[in-house]
Amino acid sequence: MGAKKNNNFVYFFGNKKADGKGSMKEVLGGKGAGLAEMTEIGINVPPGFTISTAVCGIFYENKKSIPAEIIDEITKNIIKLESSTKKGFGDSKNPLLVSVRSGAMFSMPGMMDTILNLGLNDKTVQGIIKKTNNPRFAWDSYRRFIQMFSDVVLKVNKDIFEDKLESIKKKKNVKHDVDLDENALKSLVQEYKKIVKNKTGKNFPQNPSDQLFKAINAVFLSWNNQRAIFYRKQYDIPSEIGTAVNVQSMVFGNMGDDCGTGVGFTRDPLSGEKELFAEYLLNAQGEDVVAGIRTPKNIKTMQRELRKVHSQIENTAKILEKHFRDMQDFEFTIENEKLYLLQTRSGKRSGIAAAKIACDMVKETLISKDEAVLRVEPEHLEQFLFPIFNPDDKKKFEILTKGLAASPGAASGKVALDAQTAVELSKKGERVI
């Protein structure tokens, strides 16, 4: 089914129908285009809507505010989302919670802002408790929301919240966030609200509509944060293209041990082998995987822990590759052993992987030989010339730590923990990692 025509600024997706489509990256951004396309091909995607990149330009032209007519259009799509999910935004008995995420035409991982669990307040948290009979989950979601919203929108330093979290974990003698019980998390919510009051002079906002539009504004503002500007300069991404904003109904990976979150590739991005390459955490939300709160598990472990979900991921990976005709990088959430996809895009890969994937996809009749040649880019070939560790020498040294490769080859230099420090060290002639 093709996307229906839409001359407006907001594009809805859900229930196997989408206003947009995968070819509309300039309008929907990469994330929004992927969500629309996955919805159309029957992948299990939580419903939502994408505010187009054009609105980002209008936002800046309009003195960093969204015009009334676009606010009306967003409000209409919230009503549509309520109908689709059979939940109410701000409803105290059956509340709709949403995520608000950026999504430019070109991938800019981690450069802009995300807010999860939006719509929670002192009343809706009680509705979640009654509906799920899971108070620990409700308070965990609320404390996460307060921290994210306060950091991104209210500009309260997230380290203050982290320090309070660590203090409570120490007091309760637990190592991980997931080990805190409902009473500890409820207490943490009250402490977080005190921090907000102390730092801003105002109570934490309780009106879901107010929360939503402040979050959307914050995502547009994050298009011009220091990280995003630096990234665009590094990768020659034009600043005028703007970012889209994706507002999507929440699915929860932090409801218990049959829930979780993860990221993965449909093939190994390092070797190109045709096998799932992914990691996940149980009883967690999306940011936990990349934040290093706990060490994620290899996808192979899921065959033992959640065999049914592992099978769903394998089947979904096949559908994605068959449709997009390329190796995909995807993000997922598991809620009560049901798989939901939150993002897909063509995955970055090493030179070796690019060559192998291209050749294998020709054999699988997914792409032609001519396409395969174009899939191996000049920089992929250059990677074959990069220095690597001598396998024999590696045996002589003690390994301090391991991780997933962010770039090909081997390198040595001073460690810089942020972009600005890396630039300053580089200007001094230092070799920097």
Question: What is each stretch, according to the model?
Answer:
Residues 400, 408, 412-418:
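Short, flexible, surface-exposed loop segments at domain boundaries
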Residues 2-398, 418-433:
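Nucleotide/phosphate-binding sheet-loop regions of phosphoryl- and nucleotidyl-transfer enzymes
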